[in-house]
Amino acid sequence: MAPKLPRDNAQTAGQFIAATNGDADATQYGQSYHLAFADQAFLSRPEVRGIRFELELLKPDLALRERSIDHTIVVFGSARFVSRADAEQLVARAQDDSAALSANTALENSKHYESAREFGHFVAMYNQTQSDLHNRLHICTGGGPGIMEAANRGAFESGDLTIGLNISLPREQSPNPYITPGLAFRFHYFALRKMHFVMRARAIVVYPGGFGSFDELFEVLTLIQTKKIEPLPVILVDAEHWRTVVRFDLLVNQELIDANDLKIIHFVDTATDAWSIIRDWYELG
């Protein structure tokens, strides 16, 4: 029988509050008598911003460590794409030319959703060959709909852990249903969310998207270019799209970036090719 030795002798703050009736006396003595760590108004002050930064960094990090998650593959892309099945329903329900045009655009773009879903499946299948949890790669997304949902879904449907890093927005974005319970995190600060995207990332896979996807992509490219992080494969899915919307060659020709800056960028058209690049980069076999 294993000994039941405590890790330390200190009660947790929660245990102490429960045992002592917590902040009950604050009703008599006012807001100042609340325990600092239990005082929501105090923790929300501008002067305590640095502590909130630390908490948003620490909370997800501890949870991921407890699940032995050391490596992630981060998938970015539009929140607006839907599955082929959903797009086909939109086409069937369209009652005028405008709705039909929008529905057919959704149907065309659904190829990206299905590709991201397939990619999540490939990652999950690799993990099934790894008995050591610390060698596994896990899909990590922004936790919302569209491409984020698709990548989480592909891994989730294959029985794997998936991670979602959600953000609080004026128009609330709910986590998609394919994130593993306990691995859906909510951030207030974009900066801390971005830091968590990068901390464990072993590859970045980017599908077509809007401002948010561009922001996330170029943040990673800048961190690699300035040597703030080690080089890792940055994979852009739908080569024609990316070469059209971003003239990387023009940036090189005008000497705005170096040709070497593009060595980490890979243009692909399929989930299979995206996974092959990661497999070859890390010699996964």
Where are these regions (language model features)?
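Phosphate/pyrophosphate-binding betaalpha-module
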Residues: 140-207, 211, 218
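Short, acidic/small-residue loops that bind anionic groups at enzyme active sites
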Residues: 159-172, 207, 221-245, 259-260
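Short, solvent-exposed amphipathic alpha-helical segments in soluble enzyme
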Residues: 90-92, 156-157, 219-224, 250-254, ...
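C-terminal functional extensions of proteins
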Residues: 236-285
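Residue-level recognition of the N-termini of beta-strands and the immediately preceding loop/turn
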Residues: 135-138, 231-233, 262-265
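Solvent-exposed alpha-helices and their adjacent loops that cap or buttress functional pockets
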Residues: 65-68, 130-134, 156, 176-179, ...
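Glycine-rich beta-alpha loop segments
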Residues: 2-3, 18-165
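C-terminal amphipathic helix plus adjacent low-complexity
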Residues: 4-8, 13-18, 279-285
